[in-house]
């Protein structure tokens, strides 16, 4: 993901948590905040230490980033997203992972067609 598409600062994360709305499935929680003046979307990732060691957490973050890269043309611009991974996603294959992430986006109201 490009630098402009990332949320890194704590106050930006807190703004999405406090002012945004959330939706979830068993593997992910997605918070989203509308930013009409922003011409692109931004993604922040959160993977808790409860999920596993650093190797497992980094693998999950890489799979989320890869999924977002493949779906970037279908995600609405002008929004900030924070994706929180839950424990069940640690044992998933990439195909199951991507399908679950698409399902979580659809639950949050983002229309994504599964290619």
Curated annotation (Swiss-Prot):
Gene Ontology terms: cellular component: ribonuclease P complex
Function: RNaseP catalyzes the removal of the 5'-leader sequence from pre-tRNA to produce the mature 5'-terminus. It can also cleave other RNA substrates such as 4.5S RNA. The protein component plays an auxiliary but essential role in vivo by binding to the 5'-leader sequence and broadening the substrate specificity of the ribozyme.
Naturally occurring in which organism (per UniProt): Bacillus cytotoxicus (strain DSM 22905 / CIP 110041 / 391-98 / NVH 391-98)
One of the GO BP terms on file: tRNA 5'-leader removal
HAMAP family: RNase_P
Keyword tRNA processing included in the entry's annotation: yes
Listed name of the protein: Ribonuclease P protein component
A Pfam cross-reference name: Ribonuclease_P
Catalytic activity, reaction form: Endonucleolytic cleavage of RNA, removing 5'-extranucleotides from tRNA precursor
